[in-house]
A protein has these predicted regions:
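Conserved, well-structured interaction surfaces
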Residues: 35, 41-61, 78-152, 168-209, ...
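C-terminal motif of bacterial Sec signal peptides marking the signal peptidase cleavage site
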Residues: 19-21
Length: 544
């Protein structure tokens, strides 16, 4: 009996021990996943969270890269017409769900967790780097909100992670007037600019102060001109037919649109000038084809196809690639084969000035006609001659050094399979490399690993010019200096007044002469014509 009792006692003790051990095990943090209490507590974790949230238009997939963003516009066409935009009665609600909050929630979560820890001194790491990564999150929230502003206008302003209670979600879904959303974006960009530097770990492959200021100028200019040119349409807060007027929660909302326009233009000028005054435009050697080597012949052309863009002053933010890490892209594969299934439109090509600064239709312009593309390009702005190609321009490389009998574009490849098709006859070679190792002349996908420009400093100069003229109805000394520098780089006479004097709207096919259906001032048109602030600014600066 004693023996039995002894075994029972030992069994109970062993069981108690196992239960205690089990409870201790269950109290442990999971070893295969990250938990809120253990993450976002040091510099490297902040860096990883921030860069994982990067979402920019870069080279990727089976296409020519960011250049395809201009497809379906008046500047660039693809084989499938964009009837949704341009044919009367065909406008449809997009399939893209712009009313989404996933990204905003993730960014708010970071700020909600990290800011208190940072202020309490609980984040491990170098203070400069900690501030950098917090600044990046503010930038990214502004970037996401700018997308919402462009797609939806009025939008809820959320700064905290919401509960899943229905009442809370309904309250948080109330849209704020678009000018308030724009001010919120500028506020986030101000915080980003204050926290970030222009020399972070990772260089300009990470966001910087200049990137924040550049985007701030873009957002502010966009909102100012939206308010100015769409006033009275019902799409501007305060309009009689503005939907917000019907909302009880906005019954006390007031706005002085003129003051708002002035505020945004002032902010755009200040932000743009800080960046514009710092940068040096990349040199244009005026060589339009490689002569002795696939590289080193024109820095301006090679700004879009070099492995390392870090030392280029004009490049504010860029994406690096590396074959050794299997981080490649397809840009040269498509552009060097003859088309990529897109091309510049005739209307866009017409906007490029002659070297003497005159429009093509002006007397004494030295325009050679358009019987052949190479004649149409003669005596033209070097941006057209460099980033498009005529029949006589080099198509691709087959060997190094440069062969004496090069492969040229010859006739436009308008009947090829889509990946090699030139849709309009005006072939685009921006962001194309002539290096064989990058895919020139080859039949293999994903050989390219040169960098991709995301933000260029020249945009700041353009934004300043436009904001200055919109605000003051004239150009100040800074705006004039920017304009002359851009024209000089393009090989165009820097005297912009002769261009303005020769401009005849009855001979212009460019949609950019209109805003909200009304012709704009000729100085404004010629200073910002066809400015495209997509990541590569493919259609940028053509007629200035």
């Amino acid at each position: 009996m004693k023996i039995t009792f002894k075994y029972i006692t030992l069994s109970l003790l062993a069981g108690a021990s196992l239960l205690t051990s089990c409870e201790d095990f269950l109290d442990r943090e999971p070893l295969d996943s990250v938990t809120p209490d253990t993450y976002l507590k040091n510099e490297s974790q902040l860096a990883a969270y921030a860069i994982n949230a990067y979402s920019f238009n870069i080279h990727s997939g089976y296409n020519g890269g960011p250049i395809v963003s201009d497809n379906g516009t008046d500047n660039q066409a693809t084989a499938s017409p964009n009837t949704t935009y341009w044919e009367p009665g065909q406008w449809r609600v997009g399939t893209y769900d712009a009313w989404g909050f996933g990204t905003i929630r993730n960014l708010n979560y970071f700020l909600e967790i990290v800011i208190p820890r940072w202020e309490a001194g609980e984040i491990e790491g170098v203070e400069k780097n900690i501030k950098q990564y917090i600044g990046e999150i503010y930038f990214l929230r502004a970037w996401e909100y700018f997308s919402k502003l462009q797609n939806l206008g009025d939008f809820p302003i959320l700064t905290k992670v919401l509960s899943d209670k229905k009442e809370d979600l309904i309250e948080a879904s109330k849209r704020r007037p678009r000018n308030e959303v724009a001010r919120f974006i500028l506020s986030d960009l101000d915080k980003a600019a204050e926290l970030m530097t222009n020399s972070p770990v990772g260089g300009k492959n990470r966001l910087t102060r200049n990137a924040a200021l550049l985007v701030k100028s873009r957002v502010a200019l966009s909102e100012a001109t939206w308010l100015k040119y769409h006033r009275g349409t019902g799409r501007v807060p305060g309009d009689d037919t503005w939907p917000g007027k019907q909302k009880d929660y906005l019954k006390d909302f007031t706005i002085n649109v003129n003051q708002e326009i002035d505020f945004f233009l002032t902010e755009a000028m200040a932000a743009a000038k800080e960046v514009g005054d710092q940068i040096t435009l990349t040199v244009n050697s005026k060589e339009v084809n490689p002569t002795s080597s696939a590289s080193g012949w024109n820095p301006f052309f090679e700004m879009y196809n070099s492995k390392n863009l870090e030392d280029l002053s004009e490049v504010v933010f860029w994406k690096a690639y590396d074959k050794a890490l299997s981080v490649n892209h397809n840009a040269t594969y498509y552009t060097s084969r003859g088309g990529g299934n897109y091309g510049f439109t005739k209307g866009y090509v017409k906007t490029f000035l002659m070297e003497n600064g005159l429009p093509w239709y002006a007397s004494n312009s030295q325009y050679q006609g358009d019987d052949h593309i190479y004649k149409e390009f003669q005596n033209r702005d070097y941006r057209l001659r460099l980033f498009s190609a005529s029949e006589l321009d080099r198509l691709q490389m087959k060997q190094e050094p440069v062969e004496s009998d090069p492969t040229t574009w010859n006739v436009p490849k308008i009947l090829e399979l889509p990946e090699g098709r030139n849709v309009t006859g005006y072939h685009i070679r921006k962001a194309m490399s002539y290096e064989i190792a990058q895919g020139s002349g080859g039949d293999t996908h994903f050989l390219s690993d040169y960098g991709c420009v995301v933000f260029r400093g020249v945009e700041a100069m353009l934004n300043y010019m436009e904001a200055c003229y919109e605000k003051n109805s004239n150009l100040d000394a800074t705006a004039e200096s920017y304009w002359k520098a851009i024209r000089t780089r393009a090989g165009v006479d820097p005297d912009f007044n002769k261009t303005i004097a020769a401009t005849d709207y009855t001979k212009e096919d460019d949609w950019a002469i209109y805003s909200a259906g009304q012709p704009v001032d000729k100085t404004l048109y010629k200073s910002v014509v066809n400015v495209d602030v997509s990541s590569l600014q493919m259609a940028c600066e053509c007629g200035i």
